[in-house]
Amino acid sequence: MAIDEDKQKAISLAIKQIDKIFGKGALVRLGDKQVEKIDSISTGSLGLDLALGIGGVPKGRIIEIYGPESSGKTTLSLHIIAECQKNGGVCAFIDAEHALDVHYAKRLGVDTENLLVSQPDTGEQALEILETITRSGGIDLVVVDSVAALTPKAEIDGDMGDQHVGLQARLMSHALRKITGVLHKMNTTLIFINQIRMKIGMMGYGSPETTTGGNALKFYASVRIDIRRIAALKQNEQHIGNRAKAKVVKNKVAPPFREAEFDIMFGEGISKEGEIIDYGVKLDIVDKSGAWLSYQDKKLGQGRENAKALLKEDKALANEITLKIKESIGSNEEIMPLPDEPLEEME
């Protein structure tokens, strides 16, 4: 439907005035502006990249990764940092918990020499640092570990028994209102690691769990990932890692509620090779005959761990199988579920 000529002139005049005051592009017709593809940063997990729908976490958005203790939240975040750095990105880690293991981060592929790290004393200090580096325009990714550790100054200065109801929630709400627009403008991705708590007096239906820091983060986050440990990985009766399940419980850039499972090996992080084998077998790209796994005419090994070791050594072969998996699933198709039963015995 055509717009009245007088209205067109009035709108054009208003746009010129707005551009003069706020800068060009402050108000545009959507038809005049080319819709840009959403860029992403890989998570370091093939399955989770597929579950997120765009190949990773979106750039310029807020992401929340939450789950129980020792479920792999920080490990996943460090993998995202490593992937961002591989593509020339500048990353920062705000360590509010004062618990960053630099040696472990290095083993996951993080360039620790060029990683910006802050260990703030208060929640206000952490969020001020976050806002300053984001406004600089030079940062591609910031990870805050964790929301629960962003303690307001009033709580730190007060006595041990003092009640400070809602202080942290108000702090988070204020900070998110200020930085959301800046993140989009600077194309900076912000990841909040969060913990879960049990709701007090929860009765009847619904999940008894909730995340810390109030409701603001739930609304402002474009992606929320719930990660849980679901099994223990064993080899020769030795506990060598955990099996984790990540569920995308909120996604503003692709369909939500997709899931991915992957191995987190102690001292090594997410096992990409394990995912290649799992998806390869599911899609009939990797053949499984008894305990033996093979790809085309090449035997990968007897048992999952041996096959993983071979793929770890032969990067070219691992990349070839990964490409075939991505082509088989297709960018617009629903992600295929992983095998119901793992290929190796788990606890």
UniProtKB/Swiss-Prot annotation:
InterPro entries: AAA+_ATPase, DNA_recomb/repair_RecA, DNA_recomb/repair_RecA_CS, P-loop_NTPase, RecA-like_C, RecA-like_N, RecA_ATP-bd, RecA_C_sf. PROSITE patterns: RECA_1, RECA_2, RECA_3. The lineage of its organism: Bacteria, Pseudomonadati, Campylobacterota, Epsilonproteobacteria, Campylobacterales. This is Protein RecA. Can catalyze the hydrolysis of ATP in the presence of single-stranded DNA, the ATP-dependent uptake of single-stranded DNA by duplex DNA, and the ATP-dependent hybridization of homologous single-stranded DNAs. It interacts with LexA causing its activation and leading to its autocatalytic cleavage. The keyword Signal does not apply. GO terms for cellular component: cytosol. Its main location: cytoplasm. Keywords: ATP-binding, Cytoplasm, DNA damage, DNA recombination, DNA repair, DNA-binding, Nucleotide-binding, SOS response. It is found in: Cytoplasm. SUPFAM superfamilies: P-loop containing nucleoside triphosphate hydrolases, RecA protein, C-terminal domain. It holds the Pfam family RecA. Belongs to the RecA family. GO terms for biological process: DNA recombination; DNA repair; SOS response. ATP binds at residues 67-74. Gene3D superfamilies: P-loop containing nucleotide triphosphate hydrolases. GO terms for molecular function: ATP binding; ATP hydrolysis activity; ATP-dependent DNA damage sensor activity; damaged DNA binding; single-stranded DNA binding.
